[in-house]
Amino acid sequence: MNIKSTWVVFLTLLFFIPFAPSLAADSSGTSMPPMQAIAAAIKKVAFSPSSSTPAKNDLKEHIAEQQEAIVFTAPPRETPEQGMEIYKPVAEFLSKTIGERVVYKHPGTWGVYRTEMLKGGYDIVFDGPHFNSYRMEKLSHNILVKMPERFEFAVIVLKEQKISTVAQMAGRTFCAHAPPNLGTLVLLSQFDNPSRQPVIISTNGWDNIYAGVASGKCLGGVVPVANLKKYDRAGNMKVVLKTQAMPNQAFSAGPRLSAEDQTKIAQALLSPDAAGPTAKLRAAYKVGDSFALANNQEYRGLAEFLRNEWGYY
């Protein structure tokens, strides 16, 4: 309520207080105590619905919902503002590609991301291979294009540690991203006994994970092999587990998009025309010059890493 409205309410009260006894009767003839009558008058004036125009962003979302727009999203790894900067150009590019309105929607939290995904609220998604695999198996999504470099993870400790297997690290501290990050889920999958699970010290950024192990903050860490090669030029780390290579992050599309439109999206994202609209996305995730064609088969089975995450199975 603005200052002008506050003065109106105040002056109204000054006028009506002398007549509170007469206000204390409602339309049915029953009596209300004077102060309750005044409170009712305040509530009616102060909390009546505003006729002001909705906020610009709310209005855009309302219009999008009314038009049944195709919803494009990605995990909440960025702030809403950063997400808009990275993904909005992609959404606009895809709108032109299929001739339908595609809107980018930031999920806000991982909980909202999971909930909306499971109920089919997202039509086009860019995220990790385990999520792509899950949507393919459970939500009838098709995987269209991917980051060309394959993913390998390494579980690391300092060389001087007398550890040679992951099993020896049960119950010990690990610097890692919070689940459901794929690297962390790969690590947790190595421990079947819940009472022997490692202690995850939530750490954002592969460089910070490496630094946490190097400084002794954590006994171990999990990082992509490609990142380890870049960080550990001095050879300070020992690899106690190296995963098999798996496909990388990818775009998937759901059943609200026809097979024809899904093909158009894949072709568009691989075309030279995508260079500008996807530039910030490719820079943020070090994709390289372009994406690569993907298929469902290569992602099959990776959803198993979500097996012990709440809500998926």
Where are these regions (language model features)?
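Sec-exported extracytoplasmic/periplasmic mature domains
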Residues: 95, 99, 118, 192, ...
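Stable alpha-helical elements in mature extracytoplasmic
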Residues: 86, 90, 109, 113, ...
